[in-house]
Amino acid sequence: MKRGCAIAVMICGLITSVSAASAADLIVQEPVFEPLPQPALAGWYLRGDIGYNFKSKTGGKWDFWNQFEEPYRGVDDTFNYDDFSLKGGASYGVGVGYRFNDMLRTDLTLDYFRASINGRTNCRSYVKSSHGLNPVEDNCHYEDNSKASVWTAMANAYVDLPRVGPLTPYLGAGIGAAYVKYDTWKTSEICPTCTLQSDKDGFDSWRFAMALMAGVSYDLTDQLKLDLGYRYLRVNGGNAYGYDEQDRQVINQYGQGAGADGPQAKDNGFNIHTVRAGLRYEFR
């Protein structure tokens, strides 16, 4: 009897060992999930904007060329504009950008606008006297008129602030370059006895530019945003126009000598305030 019990215990132990081993063999390993590859364009976005530039006042100066013979020939006075302004008008822009995370994004933008520019300078007292005018009265001034085409290429960075429903406010800043090209300048001397009318070739130049932005975007869809914002753009000063044909002449009615060359006038740059509306499409 004792021998039979021992054999039964051994058989039960063997069965238990085999069952445990089988159970170990049946342990299922947890699956390892690999992240799905991101689409090639994920994070990138395209943008397009239209805006309105408000009229902006600036400053400038121009040199008066004395046409008489040596030793008087040459620049003998420099006038500062009493009023120099860039008229308001539409602006247009496109850009491509990349979103790094929910807060930080950057883009490269190209913008264009064209605007009329006007300058006014009061005549000096000796100019008034030469026309037989009272030198202390406001009775004589110069007017300069042209148009300027301005392209800006900017690198910008933005911080998107916490969302409020479908709205995302943001702040931004940018640096870059502006290409300013003036049309022909029309100059007139305005007074009862004045007759001066002249055309002067406009200059073009590359200049440093910087910008500050603020605005809010509205989610039209998960990928398409309506952007409403404000931009302040600073464009550094540069050459505006050259001398007219009479100043460039070597021989004129007053004698002969070196003709004028190079820029006659320079502007002090522009401070441009713009309200803009645009669309931004983000790839996912």
Curated annotation (Swiss-Prot):
Coiled coil: none annotated. Disulfide bonds: none annotated. Keywords: Signal. Residues 1-23 form the signal peptide. Belongs to the surface antigen msp4 family. This is Uncharacterized protein BAB2_0314. It comes from Brucella abortus (strain 2308).
